[in-house]
């Protein structure tokens, strides 16, 4: 079947959970949750680009320009490493790489 339905298993790091809990904007939280749900259910990730070390940045074009940094493993598991927004982008990318290095050890 060329259009085989693929579902991803989503894992979140403590760092991601902490970031998400601190998000004050309820609508931004809803957009982030919706985007994660879409990630889980389809192969097309939308507005997304690689940032190095096999880590990708998922862009949510809302308010501050939210970002979710994730790593796809085994073709079926997505690990949400950390979140942030446009203003902390470079710092978040470095942090995501650090978190991934710790996980894979």
Residue ranges of model-derived segments:
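Enriched for short, Lys/Arg-rich terminal
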Residues: 1-10, 18, 29, 44, ...
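N-terminal interaction/assembly modules
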Residues: 15-18, 24, 36
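A short, surface-exposed loop/turn module that caps and links secondary-structure elements
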Residues: 34-62
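Conserved catalytic core of Hanks-type protein kinase domains
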Residues: 22, 38, 71-72
């Amino acid at each position: 079947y060329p259009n085989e339905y693929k579902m991803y298993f989503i894992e979140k790091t403590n760092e991601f959970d902490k970031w998400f809990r601190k998000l004050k904007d309820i609508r931004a939280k809803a957009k982030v949750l919706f985007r994660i749900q879409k990630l889980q259910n389809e192969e097309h990730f939308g507005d997304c680009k690689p940032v190095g070390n096999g880590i990708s940045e998922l862009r949510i074009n809302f308010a501050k320009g939210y970002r979710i940094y994730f790593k796809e493993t085994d073709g079926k598991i997505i690990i949400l490493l950390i979140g942030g927004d446009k203003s902390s982008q470079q710092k978040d990318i470095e942090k995501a790489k650090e978190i991934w290095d710790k996980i894979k050890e």
